[in-house]
Amino acid sequence: MAKEKFERTKPHVNVGTIGHVDHGKTTLTAAITTILSKKFGGAAKKYDEIDSSPEEKARGITINTAHVEYETASRHYAHVDCPGHADYVKNMITGAAQMDGAILVVSSADGPMPQTREHILLARQVGVPYIIVYMNKADMVDDAELLELVEMEVRELLSKYDFPGDDTPIIVGSALKALEGDQSDIGEPSIIKLAEALDTYIPEPERAIDKPFLMPVEDVFSISGRGTVVTGRVERGVIKVGEEIEIVGITPTVKTTCTGVEMFRKLLDQGQAGDNVGVLLRGTKREEVQRGQVLAKPGSIKPHTKFSAEIYVLSKDEGGRHTPFFNGYRPQFYFRTTDVTGSIELPAGTEMVMPGDNVSIKVSLIQPIAMDEGLRFAIREGGRTVGAGVVAKIEE
């Protein structure tokens, strides 16, 4: 069956469901696709179609995720739902599915549970910018005061992890009732309300091409009589011939000028996000640029050696370590195109980290790397991946 053509007419936003096991994330996902497909077109997905999600690999880690899409009047949404808690942890840390916003599902009957807290913390650590709450299973609660209590608890929990708890949209409903076609407030109308909250509360994400120019250096060679050419894939922004750029990371930052952009051996006047290009640099020697550095718009990114991160450590079954690691562990951190050695400081009270765990750590690299908060990396030992992580906060 041929895939339907992807209409690029509406702005595209990435979202996903998060929350405690059995609070109804997958049922809600099914309800959203079913109800919005009736109203705006698109494909309805049943619970079991979403639940039997295929495995995918991100940075060498196998993750189960279900991808569905749906439309509202003004937007196109790509939505990810994970079957198991471990899949969420891996998904959010590797950035396999970057989220512009998340729908936190909380059972009205149970209130916030341990994974509710953990998913909010993860969302904060990995830089999910917006959370909307769907208080599910409202048909199981008769007492309005109890619903208010759960709502208060959820708002407090969000505020505790630096989300604006007081201003977060909270929609009360029952995904199951909505799927059954119930027309009361907690049925179908609650899903329409949720869609409206997605449209209004999550701002339209900035497109990669509109961000400041950045290109990781993959290869460097000199062309006699023309100078040094750096090749790579433009990660964001646009580079035009004649523009000043900085070479950032590993060695002290230097400025240079782009004197040419080529793609498939053709000269262009610019390269943009997504293009694989060669950038010709004026007056730069071949030995002054190396893999692991980035070319960037001057002042847009700085090199750093110390940061805190959230990491997931591969289990033995995933091809990771067989033994735990301890404070002071020194693996390689693979950023964009190269490995840099760094040492790990564990949080107070954490003796060791077992394969299969996720943990917040502090890292000191032996060489500075161009980084922003939210940058993903792999943790490697002798070339094999033993973990994945994301920069949560830059220290220096």
Curated annotation (Swiss-Prot):
This protein's name: Elongation factor Tu
Region (G2) location: 60-64
EC numbers for this chain: 3.6.5.3
Region (G5): 174-176
Organism of origin: Thiobacillus denitrificans (strain ATCC 25259 / T1)
Record GO cellular component, one term: cytosol
Domain of life per record: Bacteria
MF-aspect GO terms: GTP binding; GTPase activity; guanosine tetraphosphate binding; translation elongation factor activity
InterPro entries: EF-Tu_GTP-bd (IPR041709), EF-Tu_GTPase (IPR050055), EFTu-like_2 (IPR004161), EFTU_2 (IPR033720), G_TR_CS (IPR031157), P-loop_NTPase (IPR027417), Small_GTP-bd (IPR005225), T_Tr_GTP-bd_dom (IPR000795)
Gene: tuf1
Predominant location category: cytoplasm
Region feature G1, mapped onto this chain: 19-26
Ligand binding (Mg(2+)): 26
Compartments where found: Cytoplasm
Region called G3, residue ranges: 81-84
Alphabetic keyword roster: Cytoplasm, Elongation factor, GTP-binding, Hydrolase, Magnesium, Metal-binding, Nucleotide-binding, Protein biosynthesis
Catalytic activity entry: GTP + H2O = GDP + phosphate + H(+)
Domain tr-type G, first and last residues per copy: 10-206
Family membership noted in the UniProt record: Belongs to the TRAFAC class translation factor GTPase superfamily. Classic translation factor GTPase family. EF-Tu/EF-1A subfamily.
Annotated region described as G4, given as residue ranges: 136-139
Cystine pairings recorded for this chain: none
Subunit-structure text: Monomer.
Keyword Protein biosynthesis belongs to the record: yes
Function noted in UniProt: GTP hydrolase that promotes the GTP-dependent binding of aminoacyl-tRNA to the A-site of ribosomes during protein biosynthesis.
Short name of any one Pfam family annotated for the protein: GTP_EFTU_D3
Residues bound to GTP: 19-26, 81-85, 136-139
